[in-house]
Amino acid sequence: MKKFLVCLLAVLTVGLFAQELPWQQNFDNALRLSKESGKPVFAFFTGSDWCGWCIRLDREILSKQEMKKYLCDNFILFKADFPQKNPPPENIMMKNHELMQKYGVRGFPTIVITDASGKALGMTGYMRGGPDAMMKVLDKYVKKASPK
């Protein structure tokens, strides 16, 4: 019985750490959720299957448990992915390209933080220092977005 409980706990723990982030694929939906929650939008522009820096950002920062918790607690997450394999439907790709133009995204990875109206509060990308460095930068935007 003791072994069973230890195994069960191990399986549940692995499942918790493997949890995916709740990315929105529709920016309008992300803005609606932002209005409802009061959280700013974390818009991640990426080439998930071909961009080396995007893959590195995901592996070194976004996939870390403390970063996942921070992002979920403080942001509505939107991902504009431009993969080479298995691209999203044409209408989503068109919208993502429009958003790139709107926010002046010129390369990947780019993170744009917006308020609930879609106004850009700031922009960043890959940075050294892991989750702590990223959270320090993002904290400034969370404070900007919070009502006074």
Language-model regions: role of each:
Residues F4-V14:
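Sec-dependent N-terminal signal peptides
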Residues W23-V41, L71:
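A short beta-strand-turn-helix
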Residues S37-C51:
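Short active-site neighborhood of thiol/selenol oxidoreductases, capturing the structured segment around
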Residues C51-I55, I111:
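The canonical Cys-X-X-Cys-His
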